[in-house]
Amino acid sequence: GRVILDKVPTLKPEISGDFSKLMSWADSYRKLKVRTNSETPLDTKTAREFGAEGIGLCRTEHMFFDEDRILSVREMILSKTIEDRNKALAKLLPHQKNDFIQIFEIMSGLPVTVRLLDPPLHEFLPKNDKEIGDLSSVTGLNANEIKSRTEELHEHNPMLGHRGCRLGISFPEIYEMQCRAIFEALVECKKKKLKSTMPEIMIPLVSTEAEIKIMKDLVIRVTKKVQDENNTKISFLVGTLSLIHI
């Protein structure tokens, strides 16, 4: 082999030649379908090129970390009123909707499992003085207020804390925005006469039957609003990842 000490032009990997032939033989016999994990249009396109037959997990929180979105996310988290929180969510809606439009277009009728916001909110908050300063200029809060709020939201054991569907119950407007983005993206794809994608909405970290009922009712409520606003019918699945002890 060779040791290269500098950057060199690279080639995009592709399935070709003998490997492509071998995989085509496997395709003619296999019974399983393979989906991908993807949260961006670019990753989704790459996965389709490699033969993915749907998205098994689209983690929506990863869409929030882009530079043009993270400030609005932090503004939403630090909002003291529902009105202020909704203003911040209104800034995020177009971004998330556009992501879903592109993902649904690329998947072209294949199933897409979308997991609603899962991590605890402190994971989105600023980690250094520059980020705190940027957030201060947007929210009007001083650095000490932001640091104090960050400490309040910090979860010592996030797996058992305020995350997943428990966030959706405490702040339903967050999940309402995400569901609206999904359904409005479906409507846009329908207007473009694209193949209909069946989104599978995953409610994260459900512990009880009551939690899934609350979240299911929220999803259905948003669906009806978007259907009425656009005079159309929307098809989807809603559920959760369950662990069964045998």
PLM regions: where:
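Conformationally flexible catalytic loops at phosphate/diphosphate-handling active centers
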Residues: 1
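Phosphate/pyrophosphate-binding betaalpha-module
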Residues: 5
